[in-house]
Amino acid sequence: MNKLRTSKYLQVIPREKDYAIYHSLFGNLCLLDFDGYNLLRVFDKACSSNEVLKSFSKYDPILLIHFINTLLSKGFLTIDGFDEYVLIEEDYQRCKKHFHSGYLIRALQLVMTNKCNRSCEYCFVKTMYNSDERAILEQSPKNVNMSFETASIAVERLIEILRKNGNRELYIEFFGGEPLLNWQVIKSVLETFKNQANGVTLHYSITTNGSLMIPEMADIFKKYNVTVTMSIDPLDLKEQTACRKGNGRLAQVIRILKEAGNWVTFNSVISEETMDEFDGYTLVEKAKDYNVTMIGLILDLDLAFYGSDNKREAALQKLWETYSFGRQKGIAVVGYWYQIFQQIIGKQATRFSSGYKTCPATGCKLSIEPEGHVFICKCCSTYIGHITDLDMVLHSPQYEAYALKAYYNAPECKGCEVEGFCSGVCMGALEKKYNKIDTIESGTCTIYKKITRKLIENIRTHEILTLPLVQHERKQLHVCG
């Protein structure tokens, strides 16, 4: 009989009344009572199930074997001498030859315009880029507004790629600048492709400051099920404006969208510029007032922010306060930082089905500039081609480097407690600071690991699988008389 041992990827977080355990590559978070945890630790030294049955003779052997098999199926136990990382390597070797087919792609980001009618101090575009191509395009008068022709080519090419790879869903994001400045092209895309095109289901979203919203837009968004994400500037939440220098009232914009029946979410940023004024309690209260049930919290994309212990702790505190208060009020507070936890508990598909962990800039999304130039994301600096030659884009070494990150993190990530679920910090931020993506920013890693641990420590027992060994004790027969 093969001997079993605890996986070297086993992660254990002691809690007040139980232990939270998960696999750092595959997740499967569950809770063990004290007896179950003690049994698990017997396998720290390789042994067979029969040996354990003898040591735990007070338990029903059938239930005990079932318990051990459950630990084995979730990866907490493994055959002695087997390294589970080989499964990732096998998956990579099987899939890498298909990178150039575009099989990873699930999303298309259309940069409708590089203009904006606001001047938010924390906007990443002002300081994000470090490539000559980005510098040229940011100044090019031809790269201001996307034409319907360019948008149409991008959508058609991506639909073709998805169909060839057997994928049937494409997520299209209207982005900017302020995308509503190019409303007519957005409207034309929606009315041309609708929610189904050539057998591919199209899901739409838009990120906007909302200041230009009118009922016609809200009605069109509702018709085509466009998720509307409102960028909320924390500095002006109390005044209920959509952006610092805006004159559009947040309440008015939300009312227009809600009257049309739209799904609305909020986005806000915790950054160097917003840290002092960020008020998660007010943000959640406003969401509650306007019947907005989801808030996306984005952490600063300037890596210099994470060099200070005090700033990291302050950001973590604001993140946790907002998340906790959101739970109290029935508001989901999410972000890339939250996706790590979601994957560990099995509530969100991992890269084996979705193609990425926390960041879609791993070959899973293409961002198209107004003139048709292709980047992996609006945040990234590396130029990878033009939408009219998508085959060249997908065969470029630049695209392959991003796609590799869907499987492998930087060498420094090996052995990390969230290795299988974190893509590291924003690829664009790494390019800006280090001019490469195969590296880490330790300050950001600290925040991701701490918030993940805190989320696990505070998960409620009814929200996750519990494996109680104490209930498996052999029942004794009591004879009266």
Residue ranges and their predicted role:
Residues M1-V42, H478:
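Acidic, low-complexity/disordered tracts enriched in E/D and polar residues
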Residues E16, C359-G363:
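Short, small/polar residue-rich loop motifs at catalytic or cofactor-binding pockets
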Residues A315-Q348, V374-S423:
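C-terminal accessory region of radical SAM enzymes
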Residues F148-F175, N182-D302, G307:
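Radical SAM/AdoMet-radical enzyme domain recognition
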Residues L31-Q109, E149:
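Long, charge-rich, low-complexity alpha-helical segments
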Residues I153-E173, I440-G481:
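Short Fe-S-cluster ligation motifs
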Residues G102-E149:
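Canonical Radical SAM [4Fe-4S] cluster-binding loop centered on the CxxxCxxC motif
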Residues Y407-K454:
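Cysteine-cluster motifs in flexible loop/terminal segments that predominantly coordinate metals
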